[in-house]
């Protein structure tokens, strides 16, 4: 059924709802879009609604400025009913469909250096139906020799890949399936904000760690928190007091019975980030089987991978010499461990050969 709340229309795959009392809609860089609702209901429908609400879809449309454009699509995650001052309310929490990518931690490797980043992304998303990605960062670049997803959800892994280009994973919360922008898109509707009240922030630590080394001026690290009385689209480029800025976060919420639109605006050149690494691999080793040898290097089939993908650009790992008095390269079919001395998988080396049929020492 459909309910109208201020300038928004909320459509839920539920019946028997009376009125929306409160709403909070949030979105930002590297985040799923989230929606919470407080809805007045009849007492006798309380238990039925809580039971029926699991995985129900929810759509929010903006009626005033965009003439019904979808601003959020997702599905319910948590539902509860409460009695307050003699009335019964349903409390709902929903997330964009990208949340499905963030539920299960997975481990696998990508060792074919001929793969592009987008080919890896498509492989990662292949199990999510119509989910997809729009590339605004890679320019068709190939991966380094080796990528490792280890005990990471697909969302976290893709977020980390985006950081290889100094950019972010941005949820497209308007689609009825999981979709993202890989990097900040260039979207403009000609919006101009003049003489708006705001607070300005400048993250000098972020500037020193990320932007300064790229030759970006310090003023590019500025961002503005603005509150307006109308809807702005996420990721759109607009003119703010004569400055070109991008909408990088929003929070629509109820305040004293009114719907308040709060946004963060940032200069495009300042929307950069450090390379994200996987803290879980530091000092870790993964069992593998030797598939090929070349000098003091080996190609391996990781135990975490269902099959070995042979190619001309499959990663060779250097085999580390563990003893100065005795040196013997492992044979094909031998068991080894791939050791990760730090948080970056690119530093991995092969160690500790075990002949087939022998136990680990």
Q: What positions do the PLM features span?
A:
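Amphipathic alpha-helical and helix-coil boundary elements used as assembly
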Residues: 1-361
């Amino acid at each position: 059924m459909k309910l109208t709340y201020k300038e928004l229309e909320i459509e839920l795959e539920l019946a028997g709802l009376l009125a929306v009392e409160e709403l909070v809609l949030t979105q930002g860089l590297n985040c799923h879009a989230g929606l919470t609702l407080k809805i007045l209901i009849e007492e006798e429908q309380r238990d039925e609604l809580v039971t029926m609400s699991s995985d129900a879809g929810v759509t929010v449309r903006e009626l005033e400025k965009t003439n019904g454009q979808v601003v959020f699509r997702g599905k319910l995650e948590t539902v509860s009913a409460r009695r307050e001052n003699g009335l019964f309310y349903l409390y709902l929490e929903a997330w964009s469909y990208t949340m499905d990518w963030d539920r299960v931690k997975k481990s696998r490797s990508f060792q074919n250096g001929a793969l592009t980043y987008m080919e890896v992304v498509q492989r990662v998303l292949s199990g999510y139906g119509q989910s997809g990605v729009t590339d605004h960062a890679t320019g068709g670049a190939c991966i380094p020799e080796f990528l490792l997803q280890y005990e990471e959800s697909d969302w976290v892994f893709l977020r980390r890949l985006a950081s290889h280009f100094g950019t972010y994973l941005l949820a497209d919360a308007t689609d009825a399936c999981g979709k993202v922008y890989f990097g900040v898109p260039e979207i403009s509707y000609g919006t101009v904000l003049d003489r708006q009240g705001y607070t300005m922030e400048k993250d000098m630590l972020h500037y020193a760690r990320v932007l300064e080394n790229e030759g970006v001026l310090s003023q590019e690290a500025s961002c503005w928190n603005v509150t307006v009385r109308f809807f702005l689209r996420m990721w759109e480029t607009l003119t703010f007091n004569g400055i070109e800025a991008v909408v990088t976060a929003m929070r629509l919420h109820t305040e004293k019975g009114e719907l308040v639109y709060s946004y963060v605006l940032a200069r495009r050149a300042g929307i950069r980030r450090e390379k994200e690494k996987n803290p879980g691999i530091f000092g870790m080793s993964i069992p593998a089987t030797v598939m090929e040898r070349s000098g003091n290097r080996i190609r391996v089939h990781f135990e975490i991978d269902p099959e070995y993908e042979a190619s001309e650009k499959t990663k060779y790992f250097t085999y580390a010499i563990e003893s100065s008095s005795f040196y013997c390269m492992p044979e094909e079919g031998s068991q080894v461990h791939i050791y990760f001395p730090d948080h970056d998988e690119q530093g991995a080396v092969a160690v500790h050969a075990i002949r087939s049929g022998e136990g680990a020492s």
